[in-house]
From Swiss-Prot:
This is Large ribosomal subunit protein bL32. It comes from Wolbachia pipientis wMel. The lineage of its organism: Bacteria, Pseudomonadati, Pseudomonadota, Alphaproteobacteria, Rickettsiales. The keyword Lipid metabolism does not apply. GO terms for cellular component: large ribosomal subunit. InterPro entries: Ribosomal_bL32, Ribosomal_bL32_bact, Ribosomal_zn-bd. It comes from the Bacteria. Disulfide bonds: none annotated. The gene is rpmF. Keywords: Ribonucleoprotein, Ribosomal protein. Residues 1-19 have a biased composition (Basic residues).
Length: 60
């Protein structure tokens, strides 16, 4: 098992963790339904970039 030769200082430890912060999700408003959604995803009604990608089938 690998063991560090020297103790990592508090400064270097914190610099290593500088990219670990939690960032909020980028939420956009759908142009067709007006609902909030994640970018680059198909909307609830089946549209993507203003075009119908698929049509939801009715449950039998």
């Amino acid at each position: 098992m690998a063991v560090p030769k020297r103790k990592k200082s508090k400064s270097r430890r914190n610099m290593h963790r500088s990219h670990h912060a939690i960032e909020p999700k980028n939420v956009v408003v759908c142009s067709t339904t007006g609902e909030f959604m994640l970018p680059h995803n198909v909307a609830v009604d089946g549209s993507y970039k203003g075009k119908r990608v698929f049509i939801k089938q009715q449950a039998e």
